[in-house]
Amino acid sequence: MAVGNINELPENILLELFIHIPARQLLLRCRPVCSLWRDLIDLVTLWKRKCLQEGFITEDWDQPVADWKIFYFLRSLQRNLLHNPCAEEGFEFWSLDVNGGDEWKVEDLSKDQRKEFPNDQVKKYFVTSYYTCLKSQVVDLKAEGYWEELMDTTRPDIEVKDWFAARPDCGSKYQLCVQLLSSAHAPLGTFQPDPVMIQQKSDAKWSEVSHTFSNYPPGVRYIWFQHGGVDTHYWAGWYGPRVTNSSITIGPPLP
């Protein structure tokens, strides 16, 4: 039987069509069309199936989800928000706030270091010198796709990670500071652990530091990430801590 109006189609057929439409078009173009489309597009079933279709969840997913629509968008946006975290582009995207001693430098991970590092995609690192070296990056959340209502109402978890290591022949100090900032760049949350002091003749293994911001105040618009350090023997050259594979991610943990 011919259908003269798309709304004469059974609701399950309409739902099947909506599943294959990009999410932003669903909300901006389809949802305002009529109350029937609005109600169908708001169904939990639709967004759960879109999550499954995109590989955001598995068939046996059993974790509670408060809002599948928000979950879908958070998962679709989820990526490392720090640019050039592993020095593949030199110092592109980084601000060299303090550039002491012989200044920041980029070095290659040696073959042995690559075997030890948990991510085989990492090939380079940043290294500090005999006077303090600090570099930073500011993440503009709106520019990265995280709209204001999402950040203020949902306030998704913000996870920060960094990797650092000393040289075996020289002591060093590593430091990290991450701040959640308002539109006026006022701090709304800070993670600043005590500096890590590494003694000379350490095992020089890579260590990870991580922190998750949860239940922070509304108004977060930027994230400021700064790390670096100094060697504690003041040797000319690049004997301070090495850093690489830094990351800032927003949203639920990956399955």
Swiss-Prot record:
In what residue span(s) does the FBA domain sit?
71-252
Q: Provide the alphabetized UniProt keywords.
A: Ubl conjugation pathway
Tell me the domain of life: Eukaryota
Supply the CDD domains for this chain. Answer: F-box_FBXO6-like (cd22168)
Summary of the tissues where the protein is detected: Expressed in brain, liver, pancreas and adipose tissue (at protein level). Widely expressed.
* Entry-linked PANTHER family: F-BOX ONLY PROTEIN 44 (PTHR12125:SF13), F-BOX ONLY PROTEIN 6-LIKE PROTEIN (PTHR12125)
Q: Self-association or partners: how does it assemble?
A: Part of a SCF (SKP1-cullin-F-box) protein ligase complex. Interacts with SKP1 and CUL1.
Tell me the protein's name.
Answer: F-box only protein 44
**Which gene holds the coding sequence for this protein?**
Fbxo44
